[in-house]
Amino acid sequence: MMKRIAWTVPLMLAAVMATSAWAQKGETVKIAWIDPLSGLMAPVGSNQLKSFQFFAEQYTKSNPAGVKFEVVGIDNKLSPAESLNALKAAMDQGIRYITQGNGSSVAGALIDAVNKHNERNPGKEIIFLNHSAVDPDFTNSKCSYWHFRFDADTSMKMEAMTTYMKEKQDIKKVYLLNQNYSHGHQVAKFAKENLARKRPDIQIVGEDLHPLAQVRDFAPYIAKIKASGADTVITGNWGSDLALLVKAANEGGYNGKFFTYYTGVTGTPTALGQGGDGRVFQISYQHYNMGGQMQKWQAEFKKRFNDDFYTGSVIHIFAGLGDAMAKAKSTDPVKVAAALHGLKYQSFSGEVEMRKLDHQLQQPLYLTVWTKADKQHPYSPENTGMTLMPVKTFESYISSTPTSCQMKAPA
């Protein structure tokens, strides 16, 4: 894996110098970040805003288009309605790029709003850079030319997760516990479909949906899981909804496995602590011990903010924008969207591709397990002494899933 991470900041700096004659050099590209800075999910939002601002600095120093990046944070309170107000505020400031990721219900509202705006306002188009909203519909039935997803969607993550689970004969009874909105529904749907195809002998012994970012005590859910006899829980929960779930599991003495998407996200490492050793798994497009430039960035981020960097899609976004703007020789969203469409470029996990068919980034995925940090895997999130150790890598061709998207490019 280390050999694949061949790109460095000095190389990118050379690229900047080589393109200094281009028209867009020195332009400031503003990105409106629309995500929660209040409520139960505020710690996640705060971490991700810092991540965007940190990498705006890094990529302003060195990107092949020679542009300056600036991130403007707007609190959406995890609300679709507030997000539409935030979008209008961004447009009023002349911002042409937006990013969001926490809550697929929010992302869906933004996709619709961006589509309508771009159709009605030629010459003032906006691009939606989706960093973390993973509902597969956004690159299938609801796909949009103006929407680009840099995370891996639920169908991709569940394809990889269940490929691993298929070989584990000790997994016999599974409980599905998810948040009651589109993301949670899709996690449950794809878990059932994949397990039925790959391991029809596995029993789904229980299924629950709970309100997003409202539950403060998951003990009743843990009691139901224990009573069901489940040896494994699959959950797409994130933020406080995962941190409080694993805390309740530790306190309630549940010793089964958890297969998650977001163990590394703010609050969950602390909630797990020494508990869950060898039993809590995460499927993601990055992990804490990737080495190379990523390790240097993580160390600098931790030193500056006393916090952990875990949203690698931020890097995908800035790397992709830099290459697309260099290719387009412009910061105009219409030209940049055309350049991003099908773009192959280098990011922290090697070559990635923004698939033309649906604007879903094709990238490797990593299955990791919560365990004690060691010399080979030294990074310890939230100073727990624990880490997410890589178990299996799924290259892009394995994690890739088909799409039903009928992409409509603008006239």
Residue ranges: model-predicted function:
Residues 65, 326-339:
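Short, charged, surface-exposed loops that flank catalytic or proteolytic processing sites
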Residues 144, 246-318, 326-331, 374, ...:
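Extracellular/periplasmic periplasmic-binding protein-like sensory domains
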Residues 1-30, 92, 404, 408-411:
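Short, low-complexity disordered leader/linker segments with a strong preference
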Residues 21-33, 62-68, 166-172:
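Immediate post-signal peptide segment of exported/extracytoplasmic ligand-binding proteins
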Residues 28, 32-53, 74-81, 102-103, ...:
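Extracytoplasmic "Venus flytrap"
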Residues 28, 43-47, 58, 62-138, ...:
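Beta-alpha junction/loop-to-helix N-cap segments that form part of ligand/metal-binding clefts
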Residues 90-104, 121-131, 173-178, 229-239, ...:
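Periplasmic-binding protein-like
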